[in-house]
Amino acid sequence: VWSHDYRVKQKPPYDLALFVGVPENVPDKTFGFMLPNRRDYANDMYKFVGYVFPFNVEVYNSNQEVKRKLGYDSRPIIICSIGGTSIGKEVLELCGKAYSIAKKKIPDLQLKVVTGPRLTSNNLNLPKEVEAVGFVPRLYEHFAASDLAVVQGGATSTLELTALRRPFIYFPLEGHCEQEQVSRILTQH
């Protein structure tokens, strides 16, 4: 949960912050000794909008059709993404290592690594045949085309994958208040 100072220091400052989810997604405990309750603080700082998807799930019910639309061929593809954060280089590189092992069993397997807007693919140690890209608009379309996705534990990506009924593996960041709640949220959906 970001502080009020963060909101005020933005150029221009903003007076509204939206939280994709519900108040129960925020831990009902303090930030620490003598600090406010996280959920109470979030209720004061955010307007909770529920779970919002920028797509109609019915449009993406055939992953082969979505693959064709996006220019992928029919070979199996794994999409590995860390979302909008710069944390997660290790997850992407782990996907590259796992890909090399899996490719021995599934020779036509493809891996696309999405670094997001804050991490460049230049510093990643990945096999040469892995496609690494930065920010991808409408990433949910690529999730819909995937045969497997590997993501960090962010609620938006995991809920999109759940809505799209695509298999995924997620790695929540330890100590991250949102990502520690994701497994509970997913069991409700």
Which residues fall in each region the model found?
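Active-site-proximal region of nucleotide-activated glycan assembly enzymes
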Residues: 1-55
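Structural beta-sheet core signal
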Residues: 19, 48, 80, 111-113, ...
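Residues in the short beta-alpha loop(s) of Rossmann-like NAD(P)-binding domains
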Residues: 23, 115-118, 174
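Donor-nucleotide binding loops and adjacent catalytic segments primarily
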Residues: 28, 53-145
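Short, glycine/polar-rich helix-capping loops at beta-to-alpha or helix-loop-helix junctions
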Residues: 31-34, 120-122, 157-158, 177-184
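A donor-sugar binding/catalytic signature common to diverse glycosyltransferases
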Residues: 138-181
